[in-house]
Amino acid sequence: MGKVIGIDLGTTNSAMAVYEGNEAKIIANKEGKNTTPSIVAFTDKGEILVGESAKRQAVTNPEKTIYSIKRIMGLMFNEDKAKEAEKRLPYKIVDRNGACAIEISGKVYTPQEISAKILMKLKEDAESYLGESVTEAVITVPAYFNDSQRKATKEAGTIAGLNVLRIINEPTSAALAYGLDKKESEKIMVYDLGGGTFDVTVLETGDNVVEVLATGGDAFLGGDDFDNRVIDFLASEFKSETGIEIKNDVMALQRLKEAAENAKKELSSAMETEINLPFITADATGPKHLVKKLTRAKFESLTEDLMEETISKIESVIKDAGLTKNEISEVVMVGGSTRIPKVQERVKAFINKELNKSVNPDEVVAVGASIQGGVLKGDVKDVLLLDVTPLSLGIETLGGVMTKVIDRGTTIPAKKSQVFSTAEDNQPAVSIMVLQGERELARDNKSLGKFDLQGIAPAPRGVPQIEVTFDIDANGILTVSAQDKNTGKSQEIKISGSSGLSDSEIEKMVKDAELHKEEDARKKEVIEARNHADSLAHQTQKSLDEHKTNLNENDANEIQNAINALKDCVKNDNATKAELEDKTKLLAQAAQKLGEAMANKNNAEQPKKKDDDVIDAEVE
């Protein structure tokens, strides 16, 4: 078993860490940064960019630059959140087997495939850092992710060529990093406000045990939403001044997004910032510029309800844990959005305690995941992690009621059974609709899947005994089975959630990813050959211009023709590596005569060497 990396697959940024030498270490990417933007871009030349390189070209390529893909991970296309995402994101969201997917240049990609490209970049960078192959990982998800979102995350890891040993909740991971060396028992609250999700978890740590007491949150609340409030404000102000709706222009919207995010960050340390976007759009009267001052007070008023929503979640989670505010020993702040001063102020005022900001909010989740990797590998001894299911699980029963089998807050892994019966006389089959949520009626909860148990022996209603068993593994992924206790017939479903991917589709995506990896390597070789050719052509042209007079006309023309041929090859986007190398070789051969001429000129210009036997001295 090689090294297991811990990955925080974030909405905005991702990070990775490894446990080695009895400590968890953050792994820097190839650019030397500890975090990698969770952005994937498709260029017109067919290249796929991931991370910083994708982020840099987002303004000029908004419709093919994919960010915040985590927000539609495992989401059904007909859900309200999908419609909301569709309005906010510049790329095209489409329906694929009922689930959300995206369309780029006529090709449909699932969120798993896009996330896999981010994971592949992290995997490759980790391999470069560690100097060995990486095949196993622990990946974190928001605590409030439902079953389909967790399954989709695991599928993304599989497509990226990773064996995902465990899916772990982000706040739990942060607590693991924070509380591993705590010997005394204490109750801590992790407030995790990231780029796209919010979680709050109350845990008990001590004696190397990390136990989740309660968790809650919102899988669709994060820094992106704070940015969107600023975007809406700027767009509204601009429209009232010019009559132009700039949100309809995808390139302008991307510029607005970047400006809003930068303004939010600047207002964490400044009381006022200026947003200056020249030539944001144009009308019949000419170009338009967006220039607007934004104060911290205005930003706080725009986002006040979002902050208050997080406070109400804190209140309910502490209540679910059976505690009072006074019993919370520490509040650990996690996620980049916790840098917002008002967020810190509101949490501190509610809990009435100083906040623990000793952990790096961008890195601590990945660090915790690497520790869990160390536990699974056996490098970390005597650490027990007790996580819980964030939502209740059950089935639909007579009258459209949700009957719970596993309650919210149950420690996982868990296995529970309940016996049900038929609703009609001589009913030959029962349909098991698996649900997740806290509402009383089935229709108000999330449907995870459905299966039928056939072949029930004829009997009056209420007589057959159908045992339904829910089995949640340590990743929080669910298997449901039903057995007729009279006939012994059984049926089960491993909930694949709303991801809509079959095993064969996942396998195909894994192969596609591998093929793409080889294709990317080939493209890189062509780019390197083109760069080398361009450099040689430039240097040779410069030398030829300087030393042309030292060459005879035929040699000079031969070299110039070779330079021109190589430049034409460099400009040809369809030129192969072999063609570039051949033309480069021809120029190098032709340029040898130029090198000889330059050497001859240098020799001729050097002063005549003095006789070594003659001694310079003054003579009286």
UniProtKB/Swiss-Prot annotation:
GO terms for molecular function: ATP binding; ATP-dependent protein folding chaperone; unfolded protein binding. The keyword Nucleotide-binding applies. Residues 597-620 are annotated as: Disordered. The modification Phosphothreonine is found at residue 197. The keyword Nucleotide-binding applies. It holds the Pfam family HSP70. Transmembrane segments: none annotated. Keywords: ATP-binding, Chaperone, Nucleotide-binding, Phosphoprotein, Stress response. Induction: By stress conditions e.g. heat shock. Belongs to the heat shock protein 70 family. Acts as a chaperone. This is Chaperone protein DnaK. It comes from Helicobacter pylori (strain P12).
